Amino acid sequence: MLFSLKISFLMMGLSGLTAQIVLLRELLVSFLGNELTLGIILANWLILVAIGSYLIGPSVERVERKLEVFVLLQLVFSVALPLSIFLCRTFKNILLLTPGEALGFAPIWVSSFLILLPVTLPYGALFTYGCKLYSQYSREEASSVGKVYLFETIGAIIGGLLLTFLLIQHLHSFEIALVISLAMGWVSLILVWPALNQRGSGPASRSLIPSFKSALWILSGLLCLIFAYSLLSQTSTLIHHFSLQTQWRNLNVIHNENSAYGNITVTKRGEQFTFYNDGVPSLTAPVPDIAFVENFVHFPMLFHEKPESLLILSGGAGGMIHEILKYPIKRVDYVELDPLLLKLVQKFPTPLTQSELSDKRVNIHYMDGRLYTQKTQDRFDILWIGLPAPQTLQTNRLFSLEFFFMAKRIMNPHGLLVLSLPGSLTYISPELRDLNGCILDTLKRVFASVRIIPGDVNLYLASSSEFLEKIPSDEIVTRFKERNIQTNLLTENYLKYRLQERWLQWYWKSMERRKSHINSDFLPLGVYFNLSYWNALFSPYLTGIFKGFEGLQLTLFLVIIILITVLLAILFIKMPRHSRHAVTYSIFTTGLTGMIFTLAIIFTFQTFYGYLYHQIGLLVAIFMAGIAFGSYLIIHPLNRMKEHSILYLKIEIGIILFAILLPFFFLIPSPHLENKTVFFVLYAGFLVTAFLSGMFTGLQFPLAVKIYLKQPSEKWKLGQTAGLIYGADLFGGFFGGLFGGVLFLPLLGLKKTCFMMAMIKISSGLLFLLFMRSKRT
């Protein structure tokens, strides 16, 4: 039975990590790819697991048939996982939302909470029941918690590696879920079988009453048959297509595929194709958005005296290139953020896209746009950023201060950088003002001249030459007549109307702000302001909260940390018996800092490389490997160790040093990513930092349980202690995910956030010192 339990714990970790990543990927598509929502999703995952651990887990001390409940929880998890994936794709229909519609903060939090609930509640209880069962069969107490933690973590590592390098490459989400569910059902059969055949008075025979153990075994076998049939009969594929069609209501989905950069869906209505990238429309053909395309292309072309060499970063196919080729240019280099999009455009051709991509002047590059900008030695007259706004960290890579410097390097002396942002000619809301102002301030930091053409879509033209602001509107109209370009919308009168001085004066008056904001790789304010803008549209009742967050400073958080530390210190000094809660507080802060470190590593990886969608499973698996390594190091000498508290304090100091050094590890090599050696060494560095971040958690968790159980005044049992410490870790991760992704990292930036984490661990270290002192007195 002990061997079967170990297999079960491995499967528990594997299935938990796999479920988490698959659901994360599905929810990211529903939330339009915004990585800041990762923190909200992870926070909900952790709080629900903690609730399961706290509410269901403590019943382990009262329930006689522990193995029975453990197996039932596994079966509930296996059934809930495919259901949750289906809900990820269809919940917008339930809420009467349209495909591609953005959500505010509150709907994102509530919907992800409810979708994850069926999976996470049983998963949270499995750990507590697993600890008790292992101690029951192994006759061990404190070390059993660490061993279950270790087996679960090893399973999570295996799951992350399998998911990243095998499952995602060949299976869709429902197939992955059914494979996991089948494995969980198989493990349930293994656990029930010994109890089914055993007679006597051992734990196995007592744990299951005869009538129920037979029914449980039959249920496990029946579910295994259902899962296996669904996989082998292609029922899973039918469910997959049905869920996609339901997700894209009233649209004919003809293709859906995941790439390293995200999810791309192609729909068709009549002869019109629409390509969606993570739920956001990227291009339409053969009839494009004529108004946007003509404005976005022709204004920059007319502002340049003689454009010949051009670069398009995303959004070129489906109209832009067609309009550009009306001019006597020499070459157009076209790069997409996701190369799969170009391949699908060629797979589903239209006369428009075929003529664009087959022209000899068009050079297509199947690589990441930012990486191309770093590596190319060519120079360009006009560079277009064909993305609507920095709504994700992936797109923010082309709107940051660092990227603008890269773009400036490859522009000719009178070259133009062109981008667009949401605008209005009637009313600019505070959120829209902040979004536009942030990108404008960033452009001005790099370029000598920035020309704005206000409208429902604001056009920004930036150049290192001051000639741009001196070009009169009459000159633009003259060039339009001389070049004799045939357009559908643009006319001489339209050009005069758009370039009237009154629009520019109105724009500058509407954009008056007290503070300048710079959008950078490590301080992605553009993403935050874009999230705030969408939140104002879809959750306006939270607008005041978002505006309040913008004014938060590191000093305020430091004051709060000091205040909490002082209050807890007074409590522990006045009431020494409560000082044991310093251990709980410490584990809470370790969970919080661990989540912040994980988000920092994930966000920075996305900023540098752009393909987090594919690699997130690997990064989380390496984090879990660190936990496993830390647990392994500490478990074996745990019972022989005498000075548990001193070692625990040393680990606290290690976390503090890690928090201080982490940002510099990323900041120092970041300007040199075009170098292949730096590129791959830094990639390995991400894996190392993820490993170290997990290792600190793995070292502390078993120690915390041991220290807590050693307290003579405590009468807590193993299951209660495991639930308490595990729950504290998860609650810390919850707060880290909730505030780290949408508050700390976007508003404070990487350096200040990591410094704040160091201060939090200094706080927990000082309180733990008080706990050590109280034990000696």
PLM features: residue spans?
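Alpha-helical transmembrane segments of multi-pass membrane proteins
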Residues: M1-E469, S473-T777
